[in-house]
């Protein structure tokens, strides 16, 4: 995670003794969250004063020493990849919209409590599936969150020849979660695309993946190049068992999976949370690492596949990703 914190915001934040719930959440994020990079607009001359006078800066420094930058805005737009980026400034800036369109979250001192409370209120929820599923309208709540990545982890969500379950579930999910004001990459981590008797035929897998991607692209208006299907394998030493839809800042889980329209009630639950709960931040961080390992491995195997194919050697179909080339 990247935190961009303006010095003026930090000074005002450190003086706040209200003990409000959202204040406590943000303070915990600054001080207790691990594996983050923190950028603050300060220089060496200001360091001693901040370290001695600002309690939050002092505590933050002991966990994740901040990186000094000359300008929050300039560093953000020139260096950040907006993978998981949150900005805190003292006043609302005219460049917030541009940063949010890239997938960042932007707050100022006057609105951070209100905006984060709205995110927590809208996106921390549970849905009981012992009652008949009522549809995907609850995903409208995601309009309160900015993100540029959706990863759907479900071994069976794209399996079978019938497109109806994709049309009734995946398409409305993506339509609800799609945000028109920023680029969105969608990845499916799945286990089965073709029947068992075709699993040894890479071209059949590729053909099926293309059909799925093209259908999803045509129905959601997402560019074909922004949709990826990644086949899971058994060599990762990690079991992607539970079904999850994750963004840069949130996790939506359902043990039963996300093929829900028209199916019988069950003992499953849909749970949604964001990184404004530390437990969920840690879970999302760990799973994102595993997803990235999986994707990197698939790219390497993909290169092997092309090389093996040119040499006339039968490739291993367990490792496969579409689009077939990122160049």
Language model feature labels by segment:
Residues 1-128, 140, 167-327:
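PLD/PLD-like phosphodiesterase catalytic module centered on the HKD motif
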Residues 1-8, 145-156:
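Short hydrophobic beta-strand segments
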Residues 119, 149-156, 161, 180-185:
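Metal-dependent nuclease catalytic core centered on acidic motifs
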Residues 131-138:
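A short, well-structured juxtamembrane/interface segment
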Residues 143, 163-166:
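Hydrophobic alpha-helical segments and helix-packing faces
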Residues 159-162, 197-199:
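A generic structural signal for short coil/turn motifs at secondary-structure boundaries
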């Amino acid at each position: 995670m990247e935190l961009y914190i303006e010095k003026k915001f930090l000074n005002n934040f450190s003086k706040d003794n209200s003990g409000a719930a959202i204040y406590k959440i943000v303070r915990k994020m600054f001080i207790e969250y691990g594996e983050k990079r923190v950028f603050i607009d300060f220089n060496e001359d200001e360091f001693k004063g901040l370290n001695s006078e600002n309690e939050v800066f002092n505590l933050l420094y002991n966990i994740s020493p901040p990186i000094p930058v000359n300008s929050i805005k300039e560093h953000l737009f020139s260096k950040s990849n907006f993978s998981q980026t949150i900005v805190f400034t003292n006043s609302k800036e005219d460049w917030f919209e541009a940063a949010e369109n890239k997938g960042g979250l932007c707050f100022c001192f006057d609105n951070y409590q209100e905006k984060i409370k709205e995110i927590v209120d809208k996106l921390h929820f549970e849905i009981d599936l012992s009652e008949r599923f009522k549809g995907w309208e609850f995903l409208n709540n995601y309009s309160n969150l900015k993100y540029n990545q959706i990863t759907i982890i479900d071994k069976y969500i794209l399996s079978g020849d019938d497109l109806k379950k994709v049309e009734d579930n995946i398409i409305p999910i993506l339509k609800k979660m799609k945000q028109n004001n920023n680029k969105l990459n969608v990845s499916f981590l799945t286990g089965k695309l073709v029947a068992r008797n075709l699993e040894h035929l890479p071209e059949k897998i590729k053909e099926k993946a293309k059909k799925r991607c093209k259908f999803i692209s045509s129905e959601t208006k997402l560019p074909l190049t922004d949709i990826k299907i990644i086949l899971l394998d058994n060599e990762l030493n990690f079991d992607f068992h539970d079904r999850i839809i994750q963004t840069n800042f949130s996790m939506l889980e359902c043990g039963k999976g996300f093929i829900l329209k028209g199916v019988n009630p069950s003992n499953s639950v849909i749970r949604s949370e964001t990184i404004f709960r530390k437990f969920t931040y840690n879970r999302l961080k760990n799973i994102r690492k595993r997803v990235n390992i999986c994707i990197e491995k698939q790219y390497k195997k993909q290169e092997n596949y092309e090389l093996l194919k040119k040499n006339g050697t039968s490739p291993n179909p367990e490792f496969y990703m579409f689009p077939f080339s990122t160049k």
